Regions:
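Ligand-binding pocket segment of bilobal, Venus flytrap-like solute-binding proteins
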Residues: 56-60, 64, 68, 76-142
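A structural signal for short loop-to-beta-strand junctions that line the ligand-binding cleft
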Residues: 1-27, 53-55
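A bilobed periplasmic-binding-protein/Venus flytrap-type ligand-binding module shared by bacterial periplasmic
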Residues: 26-31, 70-73, 153-165, 184
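Mature extracytoplasmic/periplasmic domains
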Residues: 160-220
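Conserved C-terminal helix/tail region of periplasmic/extracytoplasmic solute-binding proteins
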Residues: 108, 216-246
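Short beta-strand->loop
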Residues: 15, 135-151, 160-163
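Short helix-loop capping/hinge motifs at secondary-structure junctions, enriched
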Residues: 31-40, 73-79, 163-169
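Short loop->beta-strand "edge-of-pocket" segments that line small-molecule binding or catalytic clefts
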Residues: 44-59
């Protein structure tokens, strides 16, 4: 995470990490077995024609393009118009398989057994796992980080340089960094904590939950989303409009 945060705070001087997570694939093991499909391991698996009507994609420009770009071996922060066009065309090709482009609804639709596969953020997994257990569902919802790579996101606290109450802001951040408080926040919002002291307070089953705290090897191809400038943003926006319009 320290390496990842240098993407927006090169000297680690200004931002204090609060939560973090990644983008991955959630799948219903029973439904995939019924369809005769092996569990996904790569983004490219989301182009399997047998998933027609069974796929939930993120209704988010950079998330959708992360999938199509990394599938092709490109950086998810590419500024190359040709690579963006290739990713756009792949997303258009994929559209007949997509049941819906959604965001928060992926979680509830997958719990309800409405789809076989969904693209989701890792921070939803603890809630999902608890719901599957409490509802006594006869299928499992498993999370995988695709082999090609993904993005890591880090929510941080910073104090603006023109803050009128700088001392109070620092006290607030210090309070949130207390291990006991960071642990409570993790248990409430369920997105992974970067706080080592809070992590040490967690039960072993949470510490060993690879959906929430993956092994570093599984993040070796991960990147952090970067702001690419207005001109490149326009390229992505126009490409996404074409995807949605098809």
């Amino acid at each position: 995470l320290q390496m990842a945060s240098t993407a927006f705070d090169p000297e680690n001087k200004y931002a204090v990490p609060y939560t973090w997570g990644d983008l991955g694939i959630l799948y219903n093991d029973k439904r995939l077995e019924e369809l005769g499909i092996d569990p996904p391991t790569k983004w490219s698996d989301l182009w399997d024609e047998r998933l027609s009507g069974e796929l939930l994609m993120q209704d988010s420009i950079r998330s959708a393009f992360t999938i199509a770009l990394t599938k092709n071996g490109y950086s998810l922060n590419t500024t190359n118009p040709d690579e963006i066009t290739i990713a756009k065309n792949d997303l258009i090709t994929q559209k007949p398989l997509v049941q819906a482009y959604v965001i928060d609804q992926v979680r509830d639709k997958m719990i309800g057994g409405e789809a076989a596969v969904g693209v989701i953020y890792s921070g939803e997994m603890l809630y999902i796992q608890n719901e599957v257990k409490e509802l006594g569902l006869d299928y499992n919802l498993n999370y995988v980080l695709p082999e090609e790579g993904t993005y890591i996101f880090i929510d941080c606290w910073v104090v603006p340089k023109n803050a009128k109450h700088k001392e109070n802001a620092e006290k607030w951040i210090n309070f949130l960094c207390r291990p006991d408080i960071a642990k409570k926040n993790f248990e409430y919002i369920t997105y992974s904590t970067p706080n080592k002291g809070a992590f040490d307070l967690l039960d072993a089953d949470l510490q060993n939950n690879k959906a929430l705290f993956p092994d570093i090897d599984n993040l070796k191809n991960a990147e952090v989303l970067q702001y690419l400038g207005d001109e490149v943003d326009d390229l992505y926006n126009e490409a996404w409009k074409e995807v949605k319009a098809e």
